[in-house]
């Protein structure tokens, strides 16, 4: 996918510049090894989801090397950090930044006054032309999934909210916080 390659090349350039200028640069780039697309592919091929992610991770990493994109210093897999994700979600709920609705845990975007600061887009601008839909487990269209229930035949982990799996956003923030030792 050209979009993935573009992002990797741009990130590689940025990391190389930062490593020239600063002594302690740690480049962490995770592998999302659990999501709906992976589960669907696993079900279609009738193979475990880990086999799907291992296959495509290897292909991706080889393609990046062929583009002369340096590998990350650390390349964690989301499923290796499920317990940390659960702890972070619990903290977000405690701080009223997340809520549980219909067996889903959602991040309450309006609870974070700086949301959109990096993109320089207001909350209203972020909805323009978006593919976001209101569902029976969201208070507002902006809110996003931190934890979603898994069907019995799908991969899942036990949590205070029932058996399920993490949403994409919590994966990145949890691993960044843990592995980069940054405060989020």
Q: Which role fits each region the language model picked out?
A:
Residues 2-183:
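NTP-dependent nucleotidyl-transfer catalytic core
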